């Protein structure tokens, strides 16, 4: 069995994570006490991917919950599925990181990290064939961003050959949570570029837009946003959990999606989008699903794929459907919009089909795209970063925890390099000879 160990860090990560476990338990017929009440053998066939079977037929999530303050943990514990998790797997401090990346990465977080790693080892040891780790966290805060990236680099040292995928909530253009978000996000990207295999980027603003525009919710709550996120996360992992005609696992996904090691930030989309209360009354067809999931309105990240080109993308269908029809639709999309796909990676769209649809739907699809348009996000963060860093605003909070200004400068230039790499591949054509001239590449990046 190919198991995944799930880690959730910080307030955002724990809220998304606990929603994800609600949805996944529901799909596998697990009730809040960990008992199985399903109606199909398929629910149990690969349940080991995310659950351990404990005594007397109880299923326990392979989840590690960490935070630097007890608040969020308490609300997870008090929530509907709070009794599902293993009590030892709640690891928390008392101080809080106070949205300070340095506290999460260097001081408070560093004190707690060893007890988290003990739990990670314990979970990893109980796996037959550990496939990899997934982390849910935000990039703008202190714990999820600072301590989350610290955990990634520690786990990387210990399990260098296992896939590390993250679901990272990136700062939104309009909805800002804290003033120092650009600092925290830039420092996080600096780490994720080096230490993660694949990052699925999510963004509150895009999620709000989906709630307003598509779901017609007037006052969306974080619960609604997290519902969308959990649908997408479940979609990306469904072929690990259920049998299907064309399966893909984390490693296959990484191999197909990452053409260059640093460019591993993906956008995810989901179709059909339904609000929590009302599932749609009419079943969608494969062409409609395909068209919807490539639609920029369905992307959970505030960057417009039409402003860039797809290096690669993967579409995961769920439900009973014909493989032939899926292939035709994929081909159709690529042929009609060929200018949006780089021509120097032929057949860069991968489809996979999983036979079991999500609860309440006949079919659904999850879209994962590696597009150069994601540079819009990094550009936006970099601009805000530079504006504050030029005046050294708020820096004392970080230097006070022992950080050096040099680290900020490095993170900033790493971010700018990332943007110019995306730009370089967006402009590249199949005919051109080899490498760009070094000077040219730098000039392009500055514009």
Swiss-Prot record:
Give cofactor(s), names only.
Answer: Mg(2+)
- Please give the name of this protein: Tubulin beta-6 chain
Miscellaneous remark of the record: There are at least four genes coding for beta-tubulin in this organism.
The entry's Mg(2+)-binding residues are 69
Q: Which family does it belong to?
A: Belongs to the tubulin family.
Q: Which organism is it from?
A: Ectocarpus variabilis (Brown alga)
GO annotation terms (biological process): microtubule-based process
What does the annotation say about its assembly with partners?
Answer: Dimer of alpha and beta chains. A typical microtubule is a hollow water-filled tube with an outer diameter of 25 nm and an inner diameter of 15 nM. Alpha-beta heterodimers associate head-to-tail to form protofilaments running lengthwise along the microtubule wall with the beta-tubulin subunit facing the microtubule plus end conferring a structural polarity. Microtubules usually have 13 protofilaments but different protofilament numbers can be found in some organisms and specialized cells.
